[in-house]
């Protein structure tokens, strides 16, 4: 089964059918994005949230973020089997993120975008315990991990020395454990902000992804 095709065509059909058959109505949303925190342990120089992240950490404004209970109430209003994307900041910097995640996977497919630096053995194990078992079910469906280029360039972009090693170690830890379990899910994709500064590193990054 071609999941990329399904992922592409179904949302399009879902949004277009009411347009043709019932123009004054629409189906409930099937995908929702939650920026659960603006805390982050990296400072990527191209990040458009950089000022917000700095303010969040410096002035402790993360204390004003939605609580786990508030986010769970919003999730509970979504149609069953919706696709929920969690991002930040760095989602795993939110202290109660796992509580939110455990609630979300009960009735939905979940996608997480992360920089991968916090994927310890325990976190990986907890995530795989929440993984999707069948494409027709609920659970952790997708994981997106951010890598901006080779080691030197990645660390320059994130402005944090050693961040590339932490990210790749976390990613490879996740892949290895997934293989041990002989699990198809979660599917894994790499994310990269392409610009003039890292375009020459894309071929090595592509080879690494393969």
Model-assigned labels for residue ranges:
Residues 2-133, 138-141:
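Conserved alpha-helical substructure of the radical SAM core
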Residues 94-210:
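Conserved AdoMet/S-adenosylmethionine-binding subsite of the radical SAM
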């Amino acid at each position: 089964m071609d999941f990329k095709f399904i992922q592409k065509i179904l949302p399009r059909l879902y949004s277009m059918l009411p347009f043709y058959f019932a123009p004054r109505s629409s189906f409930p949303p099937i995908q929702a994005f939650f920026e659960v925190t603006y805390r982050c342990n990296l400072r990527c120089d191209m990040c458009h949230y950089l000022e917000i992240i700095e303010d969040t950490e410096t002035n402790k404004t993360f204390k004003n973020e939605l609580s786990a209970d508030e986010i769970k109430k919003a999730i509970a209003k979504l149609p069953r089997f919706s696709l929920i994307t969690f991002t930040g900041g760095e989602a795993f910097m939110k202290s109660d993120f796992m509580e939110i995640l455990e609630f979300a996977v009960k009735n939905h497919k979940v996608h997480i975008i992360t920089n991968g630096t916090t994927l310890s053995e325990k976190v990986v194990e907890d995530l795989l315990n929440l993984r999707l078992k069948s494409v027709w079910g609920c659970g952790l469906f997708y994981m997106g991990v951010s890598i901006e280029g080779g080691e030197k360039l990645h660390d320059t972009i994130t402005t944090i020395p050693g961040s590339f090693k932490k990210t790749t170690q976390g990613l490879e830890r996740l892949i290895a454990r997934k293989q041990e379990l002989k699990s198809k899910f979660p599917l894994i994709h790499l994310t990269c902000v392409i610009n003039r500064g890292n375009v020459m590193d894309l071929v090595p990054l592509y080879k690494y992804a393969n």
